[in-house]
Design a protein with these regions (language model features):
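Flavin (FAD/FMN) cofactor-binding and adjacent substrate-gating region
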Residues: 5-7, 18-37, 111-113, 143-228
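Short FAD-binding loop at a beta-strand-to-alpha-helix junction that anchors the flavin cofactor
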Residues: 31-52, 57-59
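Short beta-strand to alpha-helix junction loop
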Residues: 49-56, 127, 132-143, 203-219
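Helical element adjacent to the flavin cofactor pocket in flavoenzyme catalytic cores
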Residues: 55, 62-65, 196, 202-255, ...
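N-terminal Rossmann-like FAD-binding beta1-loop-alpha1 element of flavoenzymes
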Residues: 73-99
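Conserved Rossmann-like nucleotide-cofactor binding loop
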Residues: 83, 106, 264
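Conserved N-terminal glycine-rich FAD pyrophosphate-binding loop of Rossmann-like flavoproteins
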Residues: 103-134
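Flavin (primarily FAD) binding-site architecture
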Residues: 259-276
């Protein structure tokens, strides 16, 4: 195995970013609720898997919205990050008229500073997962993976990439009772010593998708506007201002901020004037 060395040094860092990740120990919340005369579908608390699970949990959220009593008017979506835009596009594909209400738009969203690796992990504490959540999580991961496969290419900034995980200790085999998602990571194998150039005892390789948030989010926003979607840049003070609501305002949800996870990233120089986000 021959790999080009990664040129990394402090003097090549051009930007450092920090963002909160809305972590809930029990996992994300996708749930339909009626508040007064308003129908609200919550979809928040994805921890470090927001972009990864965005299409899957948004798919489930829209199923909830259409169950029993499908919307007969306009639908409002809160937030213009990965979850809000995915939800808005899925609604448009169902012929629904959508307005996004957001405090910030790309490139100022929290999603813009995510690393963008497709990896459905760090979204909950294993000991606090309910059977219902385990089933919902696995379904969301598979749905999202399939949606992202349809977005491969330069337009959306989604590409397959080989990954290497390095460790001084043997890799675990996952939690018992969890549905395996190994089939979503092709070419996954443990690389024996002598077959890799890394100075560690254990190396695992696998292929996953990498999403470039600045490219991806701008493309989704462009698609939404081309499909005659509306955007209102504002902070909502009262839910009574909206009729039907798909709530993506996860960072303002008290239980999503119960134990927020901090994300630290740095942008470095790369050949060809391309920027890649590196998780530190």
């Amino acid at each position: 195995m021959k790999l080009a060395p990664v040129k990394v040094s402090k003097d090549r860092i051009i930007r450092t970013v920090v963002g909160l990740r809305p972590f809930r120990p029990s996992g994300f919340r996708v749930e339909k609720e009626k508040i007064g005369e308003k129908i609200v579908v919550h979809n928040y608390g994805h921890g470090g898997g927001g972009i990864t699970l965005s299409w899957g949990t948004s798919h489930i959220a829209i199923e909830e919205l259409f169950r029993d009593d499908p919307p007969r008017g306009k639908v409002a979506v809160l937030g213009a990050g990965a979850l809000g835009l995915a939800t808005a596009r899925l609604l448009q594909r169902r012929g629904v008229e959508v307005t996004i209400y957001a405090k910030d738009l790309p490139p100022q969203t929290t999603s813009n500073i995510a690393a963008g690796q497709w990896s459905p992990y760090f979204v909950s504490e294993f000991s606090k997962r309910s059977p219902r959540f385990k089933e919902q999580f696995a379904r969301a991961a598979r749905l999202s993976h399939r949606h992202f496969q349809n977005l491969l290419g330069d337009y959306y900034g989604v590409h397959f990439l080989m990954n290497y995980v390095l460790s001084d200790y043997p890799f675990g085999r996952g939690e018992s009772g969890e549905e395996s998602l190994d089939d979503l990571f092709p070419e996954s194998r443990d690389v024996p010593p002598g077959e890799h150039p890394f100075p560690v005892k254990h190396v695992r390789q696998y292929v996953s998708m990498m999403i470039e948030p600045p490219v991806y989010l701008e493309a989704l926003l462009r698609d939404f506007l081309l499909a005659k979607g509306s955007i209102v840049v504002r902070e909502l003070q009262d839910i009574s201002e909206l009729q039907l609501l798909a709530a993506m305002g996860w960072l303002e949800s008290p239980d999503a901020l119960d134990r927020p996870r901090r994300f630290l990233g740095a942008a470095r120089e790369a050949p060809g004037d391309v920027l890649r986000n590196d998780v530190l």
